[in-house]
Regions:
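Catalytic beta-strand/loop cores that center a nucleophilic Ser/Cys/Thr
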Residues: 1-54, 95-96
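Extracellular ligand-binding/catalytic regions of CAZymes and related secreted enzymes
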Residues: 35-46, 51-110
Length: 110
């Protein structure tokens, strides 16, 4: 999450609520609020997380269910950086200039 804004907008996407499991050895990196006004839980739900499995590293995201979500620069960036970290233990990729802000979604069409 280094270099990413603390708050940023993601394109319209499906929000998973009340994920199952004990969440052992899991670190939540980012959450999204599940608003009661949208029939949500009223809680912040995990969106990006890392887990360990033995000596392995796992990056997990609940984002990316359709074309608008997959086109979001926030999804693209966190997915690329998360998989790089899982594979190497390091993140070398820079945060792009068009990363979303707290008020604006940023998408790529190509």
């Amino acid at each position: 999450m280094k270099g990413l804004p603390a708050v940023w907008m993601h394109a319209g996407d499906e929000l998973y609520a009340t994920l199952r499991g004990p969440g052992k050895d899991m670190t939540v990196l980012a959450t999204a609020h599940s608003a009661i006004t949208n029939k949500g839980t009223g809680r912040d739900e995990p969106m990006l997380m890392v887990l360990s499995y033995g000596k392995g590293r796992i990056f997990h995201t609940t984002m990316g269910h359709d074309i608008p979500a997959l086109s979001c620069v926030g999804f693209i960036t966190t997915f690329q950086r998360g998989t790089e970290w899982a594979a190497t233990g390091k993140v070398t990729q820079k945060v792009p200039a068009d990363f979303p802000s707290a008020d604006t979604v940023s998408s790529r069409t190509e």
